[in-house]
Amino acid sequence: MKRLKFGLIPALLLLLAACSNDSPAMVKVSLAPVPYSIEVPAEIAEHLSIENMVTSTPSEFTNQAREAGAIAQVYINYKAADGTMHGFAGVYYFKKADYEKAQNPNEPPVYGSKVVEENSMVVLIQGPQDSMFDPNSQDGKNSAALYTLVYNPKSFKSS
């Protein structure tokens, strides 16, 4: 029986190690000033940058969001293999009550889809409607994977 245990344990450890190597290394990308990070594969994270909408690119829309109660607003930007930068998604952080007040039930959500709700606060994603890259290219595959991640609440971790 002891031989079986000692022979089985190393085999199970090798199997576990082999399985864990199949999944990509995940990296936390801070969304500050939104108090969350998003976990993405390392090979996608190297293409991402976070831009504070209010300080970097203020606009009439960012002012409207702030007046509606947005506490923080950031862009997730994606740098393609050819070096061009593309706005991928907007991330908005609201008190739940302010978010609900800003919504018109007869229209699409102004600030995107609610992805995280925690402690009377919400994280909203206003993401791409369509891929900006050839779906067969590496950028297209990264974009599709990132799209799935930004709409998955489990991808977000409170900072």
Placement of each model-derived feature along the sequence:
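Bacterial N-terminal signal peptides that target proteins for export
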Residues: 1-8
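C-terminal motif of bacterial Sec signal peptides marking the signal peptidase cleavage site
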Residues: 15-18
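Bacterial signal peptide processing site
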Residues: 20-22
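Short, hydrophobic/aromatic-rich segments at coil-to-beta transitions
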Residues: 24-28, 70-73
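Short aromatic-glycine motifs in intrinsically disordered, low-complexity regions
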Residues: 26-40
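Secretory pathway targeting signatures of secreted, lumenal, and periplasmic proteins
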Residues: 39-92
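Surface-exposed amphipathic alpha-helical segments
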Residues: 125-159
